[in-house]
Curated annotation (Swiss-Prot):
Protein name as it appears in the record: Ribosome biogenesis protein BOP1 homolog
Signal peptide per UniProt: none
Family: Belongs to the WD repeat BOP1/ERB1 family.
Residue stretches of biased makeup (Basic and acidic residues): 10-20
Cell compartment(s), UniProt: Nucleus, Nucleolus; Nucleus, Nucleoplasm
Gene Ontology MF, one: ribonucleoprotein complex binding
Entry keyword rRNA processing: yes
Alphabetized PANTHER family for the sequence: RIBOSOME BIOGENESIS PROTEIN BOP1, RIBOSOME BIOGENESIS PROTEIN BOP1 BLOCK OF PROLIFERATION 1 PROTEIN
WD repeat residue numbers: 311-351, 353-393, 472-510, 513-552, 556-595, 612-642
C-alpha cells in the first residue's frame, strides 16, 4: 500500500478540523487561557493567549448609561453575576437562586434538606436482672488449652537455651520542674488540697435592668418629687444607687462617674462578706424515677388470646353481656345478623337475621328479663326477646312485651309497633349510632352523629313513648350515657361533655375532655369518674370530684381509639384502637380523698386481624366476673383474651 505524503496546507487543514471538533472541559469559557489565576494579568492590557498564541484583549466594562439600559431591558438582570474567569456574565437559574437565598438566611443550601431526622433509641430503658443467654459452659472451658501448653513449652525451652533475656530496667528520666505548668508535677500538700476543696466561687455581679439603660422607658424616669425623695433618703436605704437618665443616642452618654466607687464596694463585698458553700446532692438518676408497683400485685388481668369466634361476614360493631350472667353475650354486625355466643367454648347459640346492618346492641340491665335493644341502619330500632338462657326469664320477658300497649296517637313523636313473637319496633327516621339503657331498665336513649337536637330521643318502655329532651344542641353529637344512680344524662360532643339534670331540666356541669375529637366514653359504676377516648389517640381520665378537666391524659395508641370499657369488679380499664391493639390499665379509684388514684398500664394485647379502610378493633367489653376481655374486629371475628 502506497501512502501519500501530506503537504503543509493539508496538514494545517487537518489540524484545524481536529481542533474544531475536539472537546474540552473549558467549553463554557469565553477565553481559552486555561484554569490559571486571572490576577496574573492585572497589570496587562490582555488576559492571556489563545491557542494560536495571540493575545486576548480584556473585556471592556460598560459605562453607567449602558448598565442602566441593560437593567431596564433585561428582566433577568438581577440574576446576572459577573464571571471574572470568563470575562462575561452568568445568568443564575431558579435552583441556584434558592441556594443563595438559603445561604443568606443561614440555612442549608440543599433545598428541602431536613437536618433533624427522627431519632431511634435502640437501647432499652429497663435494667434487666437476668442474662440474655443462659447456656451452660462447654466442657473445653474447664480443660487447659493445648495451644497454651505448647506455647509455654516453647517459652521454657527458649529460657533454658538463653534465647530469651530479661528486659533491661527502664532509665528514669530526669524530671524538670515546669514553672508555668497548670498542674505541677509535685504532689500537693494537705493544706493546698484543702484550699482547693474549700474554694468558693465569688457571686456574679447582677445584670443591669431597664433603669440602667441609656434610653429607659418613661416609667423608670424620676420626676421632681421622686428626685427630692431620693436625695433625702440615706444612701443605705435607697432602692437605686443612681438616678436614671435618658439620652438621645449612645454617643451622648458620658463616662460613669461612680465606676471606681462601685469597684471598691465590690472588692469590699468579696473581702468581708462571708461565703456559703452550696451543698450538692449526689443522687443516682434512677432514684429520681417513680417507683412502679409490682405487676404481681395488680393481677389478675388478661394476658393472652384464648380463641377466636367466627361467624359474622362483616364488621362486628357492638357487644353486650347478659346482666348477671357469665355465659351469654350478644354481638351485632354489618351483615345484619344478631348472634348470641357462649363464652365458655365460643359456640354460637343463636343467629337472628334482621332487615339492616346493626349499629348497636345493648342488653336491658334488669336481670329478670332477656331483653335486647338493637339499632339498625334501616332507621329502625327493635326490642326483642333473646330466647336464650333461663326459660323462666324468657317467659317473663315475652309476657311483659305482649302486655305493653303500643297505641300511637298523632301527638306522638315516634311510632311504636308490636311485631309479635316478643318483638317491639320503633321507627326512628334516622340511623342511630348507639342505644344506651338507664340503670333501672325502663328508660333508654338513642342518638345520631349530628348537630340537630331532633335526633336525640329518650324512650320509656313501660309506656311505649318517646320524647326529645333538648330543643337546642351545641356541637356535633358523638356519645351519650346515663348516670348509674342519679337522673343525669351525659351528652358528649367533639371536645366537651355536658351533664344535664333530667329532673330539673338544667345544665349541671360542663367537662373539658382534653381530646380534639371524642369517639367513645364510659362512666364508672359510681358516676364520679368519666373515661374518654378520642380519634386523636388521647385517652383521658376525668375525676369529677377533683375538677372538670382531665386528671390524667395519655397517648399510648398509634391510631384512633374506638372503645373504652371498665370491669365491674376488678380495677381494670381497657381501650381498643385501629392499631390492632388493646391496652389494659390497672385503674384503682381511691375512696380516700387525700389519696391519689392509681393508674398504670399493665398489658398491650395484640390481635392478628387485618385492617380494612384504616379500621381494626371496633368494640370491647369485659366479662362481668372474670378478668377476661372480648374484642370485636372489622373482619367479622371476635377474640377472647384471658
Amino acid at each position: 500500500m502506497i501512502h501519500k505524503r501530506m503537504n503543509s496546507t493539508e496538514l494545517e487543514r487537518t489540524s484545524k478540523k481536529i481542533d474544531d471538533y475536539d472537546s474540552s472541559d473549558e467549553e463554557d469559557l469565553r477565553n481559552t487561557i486555561g484554569n490559571i489565576p486571572i490576577s496574573w494579568y492585572d497589570d496587562f492590557s490582555h488576559v492571556g493567549y489563545d491557542k494560536d498564541g495571540n493575545q486576548i484583549e480584556s473585556a471592556k466594562k460598560n459605562d453607567d448609561m449602558e448598565e442602566f439600559l441593560d437593567r431596564m431591558d433585561d428582566s433577568n438582570y438581577w440574576r446576572r453575576v459577573y464571571d471574572r474567569q470568563s470575562g462575561g456574565f452568568v445568568t443564575l437559574n431558579d435552583e441556584e437562586v434558592k441556594k443563595l437565598n438559603a445561604l443568606d438566611a443561614s440555612k442549608y443550601p440543599l433545598v428541602g434538606y431536613n437536618p433533624y431526622q427522627p431519632f431511634l433509641d435502640i437501647f432499652s430503658s429497663q435494667t434487666e436482672i437476668h442474662p440474655i443467654s443462659n447456656r451452660p459452659d462447654s466442657k473445653r472451658s474447664f480443660i487447659p488449652s493445648l495451644d497454651e501448653k505448647r506455647l509455654v513449652g516453647k517459652m521454657v525451652h527458649a529460657i533454658k537455651m538463653g534465647w530469651v533475656r530479661p528486659s533491661r530496667p527502664k532509665q528514669i528520666e530526669k524530671r524538670v520542674y515546669d514553672l508555668w505548668a497548670d498542674n505541677p508535677c509535685s504532689e500537693k500538700t494537705k493544706t493546698e488540697l484543702a484550699r482547693i476543696r474549700m474554694h468558693f466561687p465569688a457571686p456574679k455581679v447582677p445584670l443591669p435592668g431597664h433603669a440602667e439603660s441609656y434610653n429607659p422607658p418613661a416609667e423608670y424616669l424620676c420626676d421632681e418629687e421622686e428626685l427630692k425623695k431620693w436625695e433625702e433618703t440615706d444612701p443605705e436605704d435607697r432602692r437605686l444607687d443612681f438616678i436614671p437618665k435618658k439620652y438621645d443616642c449612645l454617643r451622648k452618654v458620658p463616662a460613669y462617674d461612680r465606676f471606681y466607687n462601685d469597684r471598691y464596694q465590690r472588692c469590699l463585698d468579696l473581702y468581708l462578706a462571708p461565703r456559703q458553700r452550696k451543698m450538692k446532692l449526689n443522687i443516682d438518676h434512677t432514684e429520681l424515677l417513680p417507683e412502679l408497683p409490682n405487676l404481681t400485685d395488680m393481677r389478675p388481668f388478661p394476658t393472652t388470646q384464648s380463641f377466636l369466634m367466627l361467624g359474622h361476614s362483616g364488621q362486628v360493631r357492638s357487644l353486650s353481656f347478659e346482666p348477671e350472667s357469665t355465659e351469654i353475650f350478644a354481638s351485632g354486625g354489618e351483615d345484619g345478623t344478631l348472634r348470641l355466643w357462649s363464652i365458655c367454648d365460643g359456640r354460637c347459640l343463636k343467629t337472628t337475621s334482621l332487615d339492616g346492618s346493626i349499629t348497636s346492641v345493648a342488653y336491658c340491665p334488669l336481670a329478670k328479663w332477656t331483653l335486647l335493644a338493637v339499632t339498625m341502619e334501616s332507621n329502625k330500632m327493635i326490642l326483642t326477646n333473646s330466647y336464650c338462657g333461663d326459660r323462666h326469664r324468657i317467659t317473663t320477658t315475652t309476657e311483659y312485651l305482649s302486655k305493653l300497649r303500643c297505641e300511637s296517637s298523632e301527638s306522638d313523636v315516634l311510632k311504636w309497633k308490636y311485631e309479635g313473637k316478643g318483638t317491639l319496633s320503633v321507627d326512628l327516621g334516622y340511623i342511630a349510632r348507639q342505644v344506651v339503657w338507664h340503670h333501672k331498665g325502663d328508660y333508654f336513649a338513642t342518638f345520631a352523629n349530628s348537630k340537630s337536637p331532633k335526633l336525640i330521643y329518650i324512650h320509656q318502655l313501660s309506656k311505649c313513648k318517646s320524647q326529645r329532651p333538648f330543643s337546642r344542641l351545641k356541637g356535633l353529637m358523638t356519645v351519650l350515657s346515663f348516670h348509674p344512680s342519679e337522673p343525669f344524662l351525659f351528652v358528649g360532643t367533639q371536645r366537651y361533655i355536658r351533664i344535664y339534670d333530667l329532673a330539673k331540666c338544667q345544665l349541671k356541669k360542663k367537662i373539658i375532655t382534653g381530646s380534639q375529637w371524642m369517639s367513645c366514653m364510659h362512666v364508672d359504676f359510681r358516676g364520679d369518674n368519666v373515661f374518654v377516648g378520642g380519634h386523636d389517640r388521647v385517652f383521658s381520665w376525668i375525676d369529677l370530684q377533683l375538677s372538670s378537666k382531665p386528671w390524667k391524659s395519655v397517648k399510648h395508641h398509634t391510631a384512633a381509639i374506638r372503645g373504652v370499657t371498665q370491669h365491674a369488679r376488678c380495677p381494670l380499664i381497657a381501650t381498643v384502637s385501629d392499631d390492632s391493639t388493646a391496652i389494659v390499665y390497672y385503674a384503682r379509684i381511691s375512696s380516700d380523698s387525700l389519696k391519689e388514684n392509681e393508674f398504670v398500664p399493665v398489658r398491650r394485647l395484640r390481635t392478628q386481624t387485618a385492617q380494612k379502610n384504616g379500621l381494626s378493633i371496633l368494640a370491647a367489653i369485659f366479662h362481668p366476673s372474670q378478668p377476661w376481655l372480648i374484642t370485636a374486629h372489622v373482619d367479622g371475628s371476635i377474640a377472647l383474651f384471658t
